[in-house]
Amino acid sequence: ALSNERPIYVIRYQGFNWYNAPMIVNYAAKSKEFWNTPCPVFVRGIGMEGGIGPVAGSSHHSLYFRMPGVKIASPMTPLEYKKVYKNFMREKEVYYVSEHRGSFGYKIELKNDIKGNKDLVIIAISITRFEAIKAKKNLEKKGFKIGIIHVLWIKPLKISKTAMNCITNSKYGGIILDDDYVDGIANNLANKISHITNKRIFTMGLKNKSAGFHKKVDNLPPTSDKIEKKIISIIKN
């Protein structure tokens, strides 16, 4: 990266960021600021969960979120990935790209639904975007008006003014879904969006516990059923 190359650094399981992140955030991300020497690295953090224990699983993009000099994106479709890579090639920044194995089989692009007045708006990150779509469809069958915003750019956060207005005009605000612990990106973005829209923003993500190797002790991102129940409880309470 220091010799005008653009390396791609692959972290096979995002949980391994606890070991890999220090050299990225403490050198590559600071090189441009300290020495005016860009160190553009494309970091592929690949998420997965389910029977892989307390170290490897889930998405851990929050580890990079508070550190300066890093941009974070979470593409879940082919065109989104191309967009992120093209941006990286135009800039001289460190990119942390939060991927997920669960998205690799999807070829259909994901679109926001922000037209009209909604009861509540789902703001979905990473692999939760697919379960969010299922929950949205189920809730609409029950008569609820549910919007959805698919978050590609996490840092800096990029949500259009039109999408923000959809949250502002909704009855009950929004809910952020993430494949990470909520005491990180989810709560941070909830606070930020709440200030902009003057609406309550709820969060859902991983439970505050370590995952085991058996399905009974796993720690998985919110399912469509759990999302649906949470949204109904928000609307009715």
Question: What would you call each of these model-derived segments?
Answer:
Residues 36, 100-237:
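Thiamine diphosphate
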